[in-house]
Amino acid sequence: MKRYLAVAVVLITLCGSGHAVASRNVSLQKARRGVAQAPADYYPPRGDGWRRKRPEQVGMDSALLEQAVRFARTKESRIPRDFSTQVETFGALLGPLPKERGETNGMVIRRGYVVAEWGDTRRPDPTYSVAKSFLSIILGLTVDRGMIKDVHDPVRKYIDDGGYASPHNAKITWQHHAQQTSEWEGAMWGKSHDFLGVEGFGKGRREPRTLQEPGTFYEYNDVRINRMALSLLRVWRKPLPEVLKQEIMDQIGASGAWRYHGYFNSDAVIDNRRMASVSGGTRWGGGLWINTRDEARFGYLILRKGRWRNKQIVSEQWIQMATRPSAAKPDYGYLWWLNTGRKAWPSAPETSFAALGYGSNTIWIDPEHDLVIVWRWHQGSPDELIKRILAAIKPTEASR
């Protein structure tokens, strides 16, 4: 009798173990099927075929989103359409300007799909200091390729054109340039680092001050960013617009409508070839002229951490570094504006960040909500539109 009981116990145990193994196998199969069935990120094709989805298809309320778009349409920039106040505001021009700008326009990209679009989003216009964030990504490419070994390296290690020869400028690193803490001293294309004088700098002129140690003091300064752009040109040994086109814009299917202009006097001679050095904005003319749709593609590339389909265009590590708060200015990274402490956009997650330019021109990126908003030629804080768009996201659909 005891023998039969022992056999029964063994059989029950084996059956139970078999059932557990079978259950685990079924669970693993379901998990594998779940991974296989998870939708891949959508990327728009080259051209105008960017897929649209109804707001409800991506977890948004169409009525609330439409209200947000109607609000955006009412916030036309007060900047004259003909740029007639440009010299008064910024000082003497060095480069071209279009005859007039477009009207306010924008796009909302949710989970990769167009869910809202207003105004003329195909018209290329100057995007002013949004160009700085494009330069940030070019710097990232340069580091990724090993052309710059370390962002903390002194620039003078790579550049020997006299711009970093002084004891003060010799201390400047690539990171200092990218965080706008370089305190570079000198002149670029007829504009001095100190921004002194009405003729050269208009209402943007500044008062004299003592230079600080590189890396310790933040100052928004286009002359210094123009110095960084020239240094990048010398490292690449080809025009940065070519680098941008070949390495980034062509890769993400951007249109051929954008142009990155230098100044009339910003040519440099490299390898017996005359090349225009570009600027970090359109303060003195020139700069990046681009349409909203191409800016949305660029923003989507950054949202996807530098990846476009199966190609890592700029490293995820660089995107992380570029959007990390700097010590001297916690709401600024490597030429990207951050929402540290939710001070810039109180309605938005602290992890959101943006490329910003005069105008106002905005590429706002929100990884938490899988969202890109491009808004051109608007007045007021972008937060007023951001909070309305975020309100349109259904609570159960907040994240991807």
Residue ranges and their predicted role:
Residues 145-184, 236-285:
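Active-site helix/loop module of the DD-peptidase/beta-lactamase fold
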Residues 113-122, 184-264, 286:
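Catalytic-site signature segments of enzymes, centered on catalytic residues
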Residues 261, 266-282, 323-372:
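Active-site Gly/Thr loop motif
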Residues 133, 137, 224-231, 286-307, ...:
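Active-site-proximal alpha-helical segments within enzyme catalytic domains
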Residues 354-400:
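Structured C-terminal helix/loop/strand segments within mature extracytoplasmic catalytic/sensor domains
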Residues 4-5, 9-10, 18-120, 145-148, ...:
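N-terminal leader/targeting segments and the immediately adjacent pre-domain N-terminus
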Residues 51-52, 73, 77-98, 127, ...:
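Active-site-proximal loop and beta-strand segments within enzyme catalytic domains
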Residues 61, 112, 126-151, 177, ...:
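Active-site SXXK
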